[in-house]
From Swiss-Prot:
Domain annotation Acylphosphatase-like: ranges: 3-89
Annotated catalytic residues: 18, 36
Reaction catalysed by this enzyme: an acyl phosphate + H2O = a carboxylate + phosphate + H(+)
Family of this protein: Belongs to the acylphosphatase family.
Name recorded for this polypeptide: Acylphosphatase
SUPFAM superfamilies (alphabetical): Acylphosphatase/BLUF domain-like
Organism: Pseudothermotoga lettingae (strain ATCC BAA-301 / DSM 14385 / NBRC 107922 / TMO)
Domain of life, source organism: Bacteria
GO MF term set: acylphosphatase activity
Biological classification of the source: Bacteria, Thermotogati, Thermotogota, Thermotogae, Thermotogales
EC number of the protein: 3.6.1.7
Alphabetic keyword roster: Hydrolase
């Protein structure tokens, strides 16, 4: 199991980005969370096997149709053994 912290910038608030990420993560059996950050970005903590995280990262780098992704930054982090994937306020 691997873990990534992903920060996505651009037009990502108010366009369904968190819900898109939530649905995708649950479909791919990824654990963690997604939240809107105060700086206008979206932050994601994702835990899954490496090959699944690679595909997830590709998908969230595009985002939902109304989003405009400008920047995607990610780093490997320690897993926190989440049991679900949640939208965090």
């Amino acid at each position: 199991m691997q873990a990534l912290f992903i920060k996505i910038s651009g037009r990502v608030h108010g366009v369904g980005f968190r819900y898109f990420t939530y649905k995708l993560a649950n479909k791919m059996k990824i654990k963690g969370y997604v939240r809107n950050a105060e700086d206008g970005s979206v932050e994601i903590h994702a835990e899954a096997p490496e090959e699944i995280l690679v595909e997830f990262l590709k998908a969230v780098s595009i985002g939902p149709p109304m989003a405009t992704v400008i920047s995607v930054k990610y780093e490997r982090v320690a897993g926190q053994n989440f049991t679900s994937f949640d939208i965090v306020p």
